[in-house]
Regions:
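The AdoMet/dcAdoMet-binding core of the Class I SAM-like
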Residues: 1-27, 84-95, 99-216
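Class I S-adenosylmethionine
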Residues: 1-97
């Protein structure tokens, strides 16, 4: 399923409008802007499961150049803010309220978008890589309007989930620590096991609908 996308629809997104990315490097990590060329195809949104059982990939393209921020690890794209991230996080942004925990920092897209919500009181981010945190704190976090809501914890997500999450009474917990379904399914299933430690929290997971297409 192909989608012809409008550049202006995404450039008007608050993150794209307000967060300006400059090239930077810390350790093995590089912060930079990448480009989709006109008519270059890319993954756009979760897999779509049809009524007849078919599973259809959703592919997007722009008719003009589109610039997006990225973090590369050893020159491999690892963390991006493309239309795919924008679309696949919409539901988790809409559902977030109160005291939020998110596993995985990336470029701070999810943290930024929910920090802009009046009904979100705090955003705790658990990230295991110190260099990713350093890039974010130096170049991105200072641009947040509500950075006073943000708390970053340098820890492995699974260690935090097993040992600390039950002490905090989070209202909403969002997990985004995988690159795609290839590395994500096992981590998704493992993280689901920890839900019982904070039973009053609402849980959501990045690209969960896509992963369920492979699991079910």
């Amino acid at each position: 399923m192909f989608h012809s996308l409008n550049v202006e629809d995404y450039e008007s997104n608050p993150y794209y409008k307000n967060i300006k990315i400059k090239d930077a490097e810390i350790g093995r990590w590089n912060l930079k802007n990448e480009i989709f060329k006109p008519y270059e195809a890319f993954v756009f949104n979760d897999l779509k499961k049809m009524n007849d059982g078919r599973i259809i990939p959703q592919i997007g393209f722009f008719t003009s150049e589109f610039k997006f921020p990225a973090v590369l690890e050893d020159n491999r794209e690892w963390m991006l803010v493309t239309p795919n991230e924008v679309e696949t996080m919409k539901k988790a942004i809409d559902k977030a309220s109160g005291k939020i925990l998110t596993y995985g920092l990336g470029l701070g897209y999810y943290a930024y978008m929910i920090s802009e919500k009046e009904d979100v009181t705090s955003v705790t981010i658990v990230e295991k890589d110190k260099n990713v945190i350093a890039l974010f704190e130096k170049y991105i976090l200072p641009q947040f309007n509500n950075r006073d809501k943000i708390r970053i914890i340098n820890e492995d997500a699974f260690i935090y989930a097993e040992n600390y999450v039950q002490k905090e009474n989070y209202n909403f917990i969002y997990t985004d620590i995988w690159h795609d379904t290839y590395d994500g399914i096992d981590m998704y299933l493992k993280m689901k096991e920890y839900e019982s430690l904070s039973p009053d929290s609402k849980y959501m997971y990045w690209i969960e609908d896509t992963m369920l297409c492979y699991i079910e």
